[in-house]
Design a protein with these regions (language model features):
Chain A
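HotDog/MaoC-like acyl-thioester-processing domains
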Residues: 1-18, 101-185, 288-290, 295-362
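Hot-dog-fold acyl-thioester-processing enzymes
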Residues: 1-92, 142, 153-275, 333-351, ...
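Short, structured motif recognition centered on aromatic/hydrophobic residues
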Residues: 38, 92, 107-111, 131, ...
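Short, low-complexity cationic-aromatic patches
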Residues: 65-66, 98-103, 250-251, 285-288
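A cross-kingdom feature marking solvent-exposed beta-strand/loop segments within repeated
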Residues: 91-99, 114, 273-286, 299
């Protein structure tokens, strides 16, 4: 008799064991091609990530892999074990990049199940994981927590796992690669973007004027390249019946990357490193053809070291209407959507807190 | 008097000489960018091709270029001399990858005309070629035969060829790079995909659940990158009048790559090398916007060496309907379409036999 | 009180100072990924730019970055300071590539304001700049002049510039990398494309038969990768109100690249280097979905050195109708559109003069 199998991956609520660590099976060498495909969608003005000269001028041995690419790889690698059945991605917290990853490094990721609970309606649950991305030497290059909404029960057709004999350190270490620990040497060049640490004051609001329309092919290429295996992003047949939008939806990590890139000429042009992301959420979904825009609010500014300081921004991404127009209409752009009693901004697609190490002029 | 030329390439039936070898003019260094663009469309779970760590753990000096990319380059390089006038690509046979190609290698290809004959209607013909892809040292990295349907007569505007003083070895050598000849060392990592050699039994059918919708830009980018010069894939003006579909059609080598990638988490996650493809055909064409799915049937399993064995799959690719649904409707999925008296599966876009070297658990 | 800023970049007519040099802030390492993305849109037959073997055979140390990619980077890097507010790109002149750029080089660009003047209607002006692209050692790898049509007045929300303490040499040096100065060694291979220096005669017209349809994602990816920051290419919301086409328009440097690539099998298959482009203009715009075609006319042929000679082509790009059909209808294809009293070719999207160093058979 013919044995017909239809393997499915990801987990439903009862498939998760609190305390378990899943070693995600993907094993990928990051190369210059990935960097270019990332740069072809996300026009990031932060010099360290784009220029070997700029990177070496701050003490790194080469141009590092963009932290946002690492975050996207971490999320995507984890889909196979964590969220391939998920209904929604709910939150990012405590995202950090404690060491530089370079092209040529080979990456893996694992996820620790921190918690899980059914939602009050009882027909689904929230799972809370911490994902860590390490290179071929076991060096931690990205760590973050996220929450996802998953269906109840179990995935019937899930093949038995290969052994997951991995452990995660209890708390990930600092927020800055060790190469960037000392005082910051002066910039390697004349000219450059205008927005140094000195240019920001707490309370400043910046509406970033240029938007980016999302291409149908490009978001699928990125999801595929990242090894994101959720059919919602690339399988139109699945999406017609199973997507809230009745069509393919852009992977949230890409939406976040677009919004950070759109803000970058105004906020990160004198940037040196991403000190972390926190309190991130996706209030609504994005489709191919949507145009994304960004706005930033300065919520903290601190001296960090000789030649540089940190600035913390609250970043908001919206679709199809420039944020300046929304502010003119009185939109409450920077209050988190979750828990808003009124004034929900239906155009909002992402909100997150980002801390950057920026060069100082003074 | 003005001399107006309108050069055209490829060959019609009378342009082919049996026994001739055409040295295709393309001369291309394969780089990490090509690997990434390939990985951005084809999410392949086979670790050797994606991870330098995994590749070195089996004895290769670096992550090799995906065999499927080599096959695609070979087909595409040959279009200029062989199939730029072709009406259809009919068959692939005896595809093998006897040596590893690495990023940085520079590739050329040549095609030997094995045979040609008019079809019975007399208004077209079938040409049968063997194409070989070699690196800068003349090392054979890919060999295959294919058949194409071409118009009768000659291409009037074809410029005279540069000399083709190349020879092909009579029969291509083995199916495995010499670095992989010895016993297979244990895997380099904990965890990984579940489907080892031990998990397959002859007769097993696997329907791969996730599909992939094809982007308009991405399939044109790949055809262009591969140096496929047939206007059917990228020239909408040509295609409106000359394509069977009245629009651009996705290059068949890409369709094959999508279908193999869609099957890969369930069949190739413990894969080490592609031992060959055979008896491949494209029963119908694929357009941008179509969603591809795959199904596999295990047709042979053999012990090959210490730590690994070979499994031979019959793979089928279909469009816009998941294979599980087709099987539920009683579709005869795994019988070749050519020569079927009845029960033709109109959704089928590719069928091929693939042999993989897979790790064993036992 | 909240300070809301909406920074805008580029310059309007009164923002330009004749004699000023703007050091563009982008600082980008060119990598194999950029080369592959470029090759995935522009199928260029010129061997030097695609093959390490071919490049080394003429004395270069590696496969160089395509000159057309350098020109595109130069134009795009300058948008932030020069043309982000521009209404139209009017002309390219004196484009040259005096040194080879290799993958791994880090590029910057600067623009010297050569002149500016209001147009007669008084509601806009023309700015004329010379842009230079240099590598990490200050070596000039691309120089060109261009003219753009800009609005009158000033950009109110433009942040104050970082200091631009850069100087440009008065006149860029030669047209050939020093590695290519000596006699040309024979080709590294048997076979290759047919069109050597010997095959062209002044007055020859060549209609290139295969067209290329432009993908929506791919042209946005390229504009983003190049760091072109004009919203016209990627921001559909902006374009609906501010584009002449009421939708996104393809960056002209890409249109030029497509047209040169479409001509390349017939003109550049025996090419060694681009000796320069001149008298270039874009008579009309191109949108995603348009199909581009090319035609060439030989306007000069000279002996240049042992083994090679130069050929100068007048190249024309048209959209959605093959040039052979336009010629059959009596179109005056090779007369520049600007200043034509009658017989304007409305399908024409680019025209430019290109000089190539080509191998000789004799």
């Amino acid at each position: 008799m013919v044995r017909v199998r239809s393997p499915r991956y990801g987990r439903k609520l009862d498939d998760f064991t609190v305390g378990a660590v899943y070693a995600h099976p993907w094993d990928v060498t990051v190369d210059e091609g990935m960097l270019a495909l990332f740069a072809a969608s996300f026009q990031d003005a932060l010099p360290t990530y784009a220029s070997r000269v700029a990177a070496r001028s701050v003490g790194l041995r080469d141009r590092p892999v963009s932290p946002l690419l690492l975050l996207n790889l971490g999320i995507s690698f984890s889909v196979h074990d964590v969220s391939e059945q998920a209904i929604a991605h709910l939150a990012y917290t405590d995202v950090r990049f404690p060491a530089a990853c370079y092209p040529g490094d080979t990456l893996r990721a694992s996820s620790l199940v921190i918690g899980k609970k059914p939602v009050s309606t009882g027909d689904k649950g929230v799972v809370h994981v911490r994902t860590q991305v390490v290179n071929q030497d076991g060096l931690l290059v990205c760590s973050f927590e996220r929450k996802a909404l998953v269906p109840p029960g179990r995935v019937a057709e899930r093949p038995e796992d290969a052994p997951h004999a991995v452990a995660q350190p209890d708390a990930p270490p600092g927020r800055l690669p060790k190469e960037l620990d000392g005082p910051l040497p002066p910039p390697a060049r004349q000219g450059g973007f205008a927005c140094a640490w000195d240019d920001f004051e707490v309370g400043d609001v910046i509406t970033h004027e240029v938007g980016r329309t999302i291409g149908d092919s490009e978001h699928m290429q990125l999801a595929t390249l990242l090894r994101n295996s959720h059919p919602l992003h690339v399988d139109e047949q699945y999406s017609r019946s199973s997507s809230f939008a009745k069509t393919r939806v852009v992977h949230g990590g890409l939406v976040l990357s677009w919004v950070l890139a759109l803000s970058s000429r105004d906020t990160a042009g004198c940037g040196v490193w991403d000190l972390g992301l926190d309190e991130g959420a996706h209030p609504s979904g994005v489709l191919a053809g949507d145009t994304l825009f960004a706005a930033s609010k300065v919520i903290a500014r601190e001296e960090a070291k000789s030649g540089a300081g940190s600035v913390t921004f609250r970043l908001v991404g919206v679709k199809n209407t420039p944020p300046r127009a929304l502010l003119d209409q009185g939109a409450d752009l920077f209050t988190p959507e979750l828990g808003k009693a009124e004034g929900r901004v239906k155009e909002k697609v992402v909100e997150i807190t980002r801390t950057l190490l920026l060069r100082r002029r003074s």
